[in-house]
Amino acid sequence: MLYLCGGKILRVKRILDIIKDWMLPIAIVLGIVSYLILHFIPVLHENVEPWFSVFAKDVQPVFVATMLFLQFNKISPHDLKIKRWHFALLAFQLVSFAAMALLAAGLPEGDWKILAESAMLCFVCPTAAAAGVITDKLGGSLSDTVTYVVMINVAATIFIPLAIPVVKDTGDMTFIQYVLAISKRIFPLLVLPLLLAWAIRYGWRKLQRKLMRYTHWAFYFWGISLCLSIYLATRATVTSGISLWIGIAIAAISLAACMLQFWFGHHVAGSGSRSDSITAGQALGQKNSGFLIWVGYSFLTPVTSVAGGLYSIWQNLVNSLELFQAKKHKTA
């Protein structure tokens, strides 16, 4: 009897290990396929897709916030230290963003302006809050990732409101209104889990020690969040109504921006440790694609939101490759 129970436990463990190893590609495929099924089967498109899309949009940030809370339990405020490569990444994002914004501002309304706006968004978009999960698995520094997540989110909150009125006629919205709109989108997801984790760390150490046992659950919350994110990204792309050539052009621009930022991040910190190279690559390459989609749809030409959906797919394909290479290197 014990032998049978032990065999079942081993089988379950093997299944969980397989899911863990293949979580990222599983989430990508499941997110894409699930939306396409709901979109192209008429009865599901009418009765299921509308409410499930609203559900996915509402619940996805909850999974991200829970994941961040579990991760932040591992980090002390003293662990957040700014390094030189943090400033290099910040300068790269802001200079690239400014260059694309000036280009977009000088172009008339039309396809070329859409492409410039798409590139602009791909460069300024803040680091994904979930970047620490992959960074941690690859052997990078979670605390250094969180440091840059905070830095770029603060910078984006200031610089995006400065650039948008230059690129697009935005009516009566003021700088402060832009800042407040973006802050409401960013900070509840990032700041509240951080403050809660640190409040527990310094006010309820016994609970904090118990929560430390469950920090590995952050990976599974990330997997669910990623699946929903890919679902929403696929929906934004399919329902955009863009022409074929614009779709291909935005795909090419978002892919180029993705590869360039992963490459620059890895190389700008290459003179440091391997951990720094991994961390900088993830900090610059991984983007909060949901935020990118929202800014494009809300303040710029709406079809630029497609860049966010496509960037999400590219960055997760890069992450899949990096995780595969890391596992291969580990077993070699």
Feature-to-residue mapping (PLM):
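Alpha-helical transmembrane segments of multi-pass small-molecule/ion transporters
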Residues: L2-A332
